[in-house]
Every structure is written in C-alpha cells, then in structure tokens.
A protein has these predicted regions:
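Juxtamembrane intracellular "pre-TM" segments in multi-pass secondary transporters
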Residues: 2-4, 192-225, 251
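Extracytoplasmic gate region of multi-pass secondary transporters
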Residues: 29-30, 220-276, 331, 335, ...
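Extracellular/periplasmic helix-loop-helix junction of adjacent transmembrane segments
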Residues: 32-62
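Conserved MFS/SLC helix-loop-helix module at the cytosolic interface between two early adjacent transmembrane helices
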Residues: 62-98
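Helix-breaking motifs and short loop linkers at transmembrane-helix boundaries and internal kinks
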Residues: 75, 96-102, 130, 314-315
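Structural signature of the two symmetry-related core transmembrane helices
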Residues: 78-92, 292-308
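Cytoplasmic helix-loop-helix junction between adjacent transmembrane helices
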Residues: 106-144
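Helix-loop-helix hairpin linking two adjacent transmembrane segments in secondary transporters
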Residues: 141, 145-190
Length: 343
C-alpha cells in the first residue's frame, strides 16, 4: 500500500473524494431554498438566505490562516479526518433544523470545519509528491472541488423527489462513513511527523511566536496587494456561485429542481475548461515573460466582467447559459494561476 511510487497517488485519490464532499456539502444549500422555505418561513426572505451563505464565507475566511497554522503543527491525517467528520455531521444535523437560527449556527460550524481541510490536504499532497508530479497531483485534487460543486446542484432534485431533510441526512451519512475509510487508508507523511517533533523539541525561547509571524505578515505591503488581488474577484465570484441557481430559476422560469443542476454543472464544467486553458497558456507565456502568469490571470478576471453583466441582464436560455459559461471559463483561468503566482 505504501509503495513509494503508488501510495502518493492513493493519497490524491482518497483526498479527491474528500474535496468532492467539501464542495458538494457547501453548494447544495444554494439550490434548496425553494424546498426549505416551506418549512422554514424565514428563508422566504432573500436577506435571510444570503445571511446563511455569508456566515459560512466570513468564518471560512477568518479561519483559513488559523487552519494553516494548525496544519503545520499537528498530524494532518487526523485534521482531515476530523474536518470531514464534523462538516458531514453538521450536514446530517441540518436535516433536523426547525428554524433559521439553528441553520445559521450549523452553517457557521460548517465554515470552521471546512476551513481546516484545504491547507491540510494541499500540504499533505505536496509532501507526498516531490518533484515533477506535485503540480499534477494538486491539479487532479482540485478537480474534485468542481465535481463536488456540480453534484451539489442535484440537492434540489433530490429534495424534490424525497425531502430536503432526507437529502441533508444522506449526504451527511456519506461523509461520516467516508471519514472511517480515511482512518484506515490515509497516512501522514513521515517527514512531516519528524518536522513536528523537531518543533516540539525546540526550546520555547527559540520558537517563532504566532504573533510575531502575523506582525511580520501584516506589515508587508506585498501581503495586502495579494489580499486585495484575491478578494476582488471573490466578491462577485461567490455571489455568483451562491445565487446562480436562484437566478437561473427566476430568469428562465424553470423549477429549482432543474435550475440547480443546470447552474452548478455550467459553472463547474466551464471552470474546469478554464483551469486547463489557463494552465497551458500561462506555462507557455511565463517561459517568454516572467509576468506571464499574472497577465493570464488578469485575462481570466477580465472575462468575468462582461459575463456578470450578461447574467444580470439576460433573460433567454442562450444568454444566461452563455454568460455562465463565460464566467466559469474566466474564473477558471484566474483560479489556475493563483497558487503558481504565490509560489
């Protein structure tokens, strides 16, 4: 199992499913407003539904750097397992929610637990894949996010056939069961265990404090430029991903059971295409110009601007779907170059 040539890809395969569950569980709520508002009347207000989506993102954003600090200091296998188990349990419990406040707090807990996953998973993959396979391994893992986003769109379809409560229950049970699979087969990289022990054995006066590290980070002007660079497209990006099912249903006059899968598959497939195109283009451009990745990312970001306008003003199937495809390709091109730019 732990063959040095095979097991690194077993890790990618195991975590690919976790990545799928990560985006599936967070995305499915955006398609289930229609089914849920019959029982939870507060969801008839767009402001209340928006608050559910926003609390997750706020907590996810604030927890991400904390998650990175934790991942550097503990066994990442158990962090991944614990993260998956908690957010899957939260998904299961959402099926028992009887009012808006219960949903709100469960969504907040999901933000904490899901934020712990990505830093741990990416660093775990990076440690198991040294050299030429690292970028490919990370890229394969990221495709799990797009597939999960697409599958999450079927939450509305499942809710229409069964019930929204049963949909949350079964999606949660799948994640809880898979966390048990990870306990058996996912392994921490031995190098990381050695590094953690060295940190633990380092005299306290020689250990860099978290506060000093954050102080150094926040006083670096380059950090703020990068922060704005990531934040600017995230505002329309997450608004689009969270509200696109509703927009499709309203603009095209189709039931949410159809609008959910159509919208999420449109974004997921086009984003995947954008990632591939953006990666190929930037890899070639950077060989001729050191700013090639930055320019490629800027092109992708620029494509999202007309797409957002078309999404807002379009009322025909072709215009709305076309705008969704354009947005996904542009965001995928932008997304493909984020991490390489940082590295």
């Amino acid at each position: 199992m732990k063959n040095k040539n095979i097991y690194p890809w077993v890790v990618v395969g195991l975590l690919w499913i976790v990545a799928l569950l990560n985006y599936m569980d967070r995305q499915m709520l955006s398609t289930m407003q229609e089914a849920m508002k019959v029982d939870i009347v507060e969801l008839n207000k767009a402001e209340a539904f928006g608050a559910l989506m926003a609390i997750f993102l706020w907590i996810y954003g604030f927890m991400s750097p904390v998650a990175g600090i934790i991942a550097d200091r503990v066994n990442r296998k158990w962090l991944v397992v614990g993260s998956l188990f908690v957010w899957s349990a939260v998904t299961f419990l959402m099926g028992y929610a009887q009012d808006f406040h219960e949903l709100y707090w469960l969504r907040a807990i999901m933000g904490i637990s899901e934020a712990l996953y990505i830093p741990s998973a990416l660093s775990l993959i990076a440690d198991w894949h040294e050299g030429k396979s690292r970028s490919l391994a990370v890229g394969v893992h990221m495709t799990g996010l797009y597939v999960g986003q697409a599958i999450g769109g079927f939450g509305a379809t499942a809710a229409a056939v069964f019930s929204w409560q049963s949909t949350f229950h079964w999606f949660g049970i799948v994640g809880i069961a898979y966390s048990l699979v990870l306990i058996l087969f996912l392994k921490e990289n031995p190098i990381h265990n050695i590094a953690v022990k060295e940190i633990d054995n380092t005299p306290k006066e020689k250990k860099p404090s978290v506060i000093s590290g954050l102080s150094l980070l926040f006083t670096n002007w380059a950090f703020w430029i990068i922060l704005i660079y990531f934040a600017a497209p995230s505002l329309p990006g997450w608004a689009t991903k969270n509200w696109l099912p509703t927009l499709f249903a309203d603009s095209l006059n189709i039931p949410m059971a159809e609008a959910g899968p159509i919208s999420t598959i449109t974004i997921a497939v086009s984003s995947f295409i954008g990632v591939i195109l953006g990666g190929i283009l930037s890899d070639r451009w950077v060989q001729k110009n050191i700013r090639g990745r930055i320019y490629t990312g800027a092109i992708g970001l620029g494509m999202t601007i007309p797409a957002l306008l078309l999404l807002g003003f379009g009322h025909s199937f072709i215009s709305v779907i076309g705008a969704g495809l354009l947005f996904g390709i542009g965001f995928g091109i932008f997304d493909a170059n984020n991490m390489p730019i940082l590295c």
